[in-house]
């Protein structure tokens, strides 16, 4: 799995270590053309330690590192302590997910399952928190209903 190191600087004193990992939560960025660095800066300006997602998948299918994998995320209120957050570039209210993103998303889920040596549950953000994110059923698209 090729994951591009985004070389992001975090407020280390605010990063908490995740003790267990049970699931993956899928998101869309709600914007097109936004880089992982721009999201990181936006989240820093909100007072967070940095980007809340662990991975960011651009429309070309390139996967970028976000928040360190060992750290508690900031992407799904009430479910950050035991989940990994994956964000897909795009506003899926009007943009279609690209085939490159689908392939990269499937590969990333398999990579994470191997990394944690178990089959992680997969959720759309809206299944765990009242939001329209990610608008489309990413879970079904990426897992063929097998999670």
Give, region by region, the residue ranges found by the protein language model.
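A broad, low-amplitude sensor of folded, mature protein cores
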Residues: 35, 55, 77-80, 86
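Basic/polar, cationic surfaces and motifs that engage anionic cell-wall
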Residues: 1-25, 62-63, 68, 79-82, ...
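Secreted/periplasmic proteins that engage bacterial cell-wall peptidoglycan
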Residues: 15-70
């Amino acid at each position: 799995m090729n994951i591009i190191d985004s070389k992001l600087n975090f407020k280390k004193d605010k990063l908490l270590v995740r003790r267990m990992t049970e699931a993956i939560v899928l998101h869309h960025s709600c914007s097109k053309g936004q880089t992982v660095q721009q999201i990181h800066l936006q989240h820093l300006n909100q007072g967070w330690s940095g980007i809340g997602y662990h991975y960011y998948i651009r429309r070309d299918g390139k996967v970028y590192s976000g928040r360190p994998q060992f750290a508690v995320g900031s992407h799904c209120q009430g479910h950050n302590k035991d989940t990994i957050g994956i964000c897909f570039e795009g506003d899926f209210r009007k943009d279609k997910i690209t085939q490159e993103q689908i392939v990269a998303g499937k590969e990333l889920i398999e990579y994470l399952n191997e990394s944690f040596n178990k089959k992680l549950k997969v959720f759309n953000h809206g299944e765990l928190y009242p939001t329209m994110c990610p608008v489309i059923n990413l879970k079904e698209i990426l897992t063929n209903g097998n999670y």
